[in-house]
Amino acid sequence: MKEMKVIIAGPRGRMGHEAVLLMERTEHFNLVAAVDYKHGGEKISDLPGMPALDATIYADLHTCLEEVEADVLLDLTTPEVGKQHVTLAVERGLRSVIGTTGFTEEELKQLTETAKEKAVGTIIAPNFAIGAVLMMKFSQMAAKYFQDVEVIELHHDQKLDAPSGTAVKTVELIRQNRESKQQGHPNEVEQLEGARGANVDGIHIHSVRLPGLIAHQEVMFGGDGQMLTVRHDSFNRASFMSGVKLSIETVMNLDHLVYGLENIID
C-alpha cells in the first residue's frame, strides 16, 4: 500500500499515544509531525513512553501546515480544538480524520458543505471501535421491532462532553427506524430535575462518568414480557485503533465528509 504521511494532533493523550504506536507498527503510515501546544519544537521521541520516532512537534496546527507536507490529519484533541483543526484542514484541502465529538448539527452541516465544495475527504467518527459501530447498527435494526428504548453511556471521569457522541449517533440511527414517541407514563413527574436523563424524541439518554471506566454503552429495548439489551465495552484505547487505521486508509479515497464509521465499513 502507498505510504501515507500523517500528522497527529494530541499525541500526549491516551488515544494519541496509542495512535503514535499505530504509526510505528504500520509500514505504510509515516508520522511526519505532531501538534501539541505544550511541547512545540520537541520530537515525538522526547515525550515519555513514546517510540523512537523523529517527527517534530508543533505548538499549533497552522504553523505545522505551513512547514510540513502531509496526506492526513488525525485529530485526537478536545471538542473545541478539534472543531478548529478540522475547519482549518478542510479549508486548506487536507484530508482529516477527527476523533473528537461534540459537533452540533449546524457545525456538521457547514463542514459537510465546505468539504464537498473543496472536494476534500473528511471522516468524523464518534467512536473508532468496530464493535461500537456494530452496536449502533444492531440498535438501529432492533428499533424497527422495539419502539421503547433508552440509552445508557458510561465513560471515564475526564470526558468533557455529555452525552457522548456515540450515544447521540446511536439515537440518530434509531430514529431512522422509529417514529417520535413519548415513553413512560403521560403524567410522569421528575422529583429531581434531570432524573430521567436527556430526552430526544422520547428516547432518554443517561450519562455516567466515573474513574475506572473507559468507554461503554448499552441500549435497552423494552417490549411486552421481554427486554433486549445491546452492549459494547472498550476496556482500553487499543480497541479504537482498528477503526483509526481503517479511517486513515479510507479517507485517502474520499472527496466529501463522512460522519460515523458505520458509513465506511461493509
Curated annotation (Swiss-Prot):
Keyword NADP included in the entry's annotation: yes
Keywords: Amino-acid biosynthesis, Cytoplasm, Diaminopimelate biosynthesis, Lysine biosynthesis, NAD, NADP, Oxidoreductase
Cystine bridges: none
KW Ion transport (keyword) present: no
Coiled-coil intervals: none
Positions bound to NAD(+): G10, P11, R12, G13, R14, M15, G99, T100, T101, A125, P126, N127, F128
CDD domains found in the cross-reference section: DHDPR_N
The enzyme's E.C. designation: 1.17.1.8
GO terms assigned for molecular function: 4-hydroxy-tetrahydrodipicolinate reductase; NAD binding; NADP binding; oxidoreductase activity, acting on CH or CH2 groups, NAD or NADP as acceptor
Binding locations of (S)-2,3,4,5-tetrahydrodipicolinate: H156, G165, T166
Pathway: Amino-acid biosynthesis; L-lysine biosynthesis via DAP pathway; (S)-tetrahydrodipicolinate from L-aspartate: step 4/4
GO biological process, one term: lysine biosynthetic process via diaminopimelate
Gene Ontology cellular component list: cytosol
Gene3D superfamilies (alphabetical): Dihydrodipicolinate Reductase, domain 2, NAD(P)-binding Rossmann-like Domain
Family to which this protein belongs: Belongs to the DapB family.
UniProt name for this protein: 4-hydroxy-tetrahydrodipicolinate reductase
Encoding gene (name): dapB
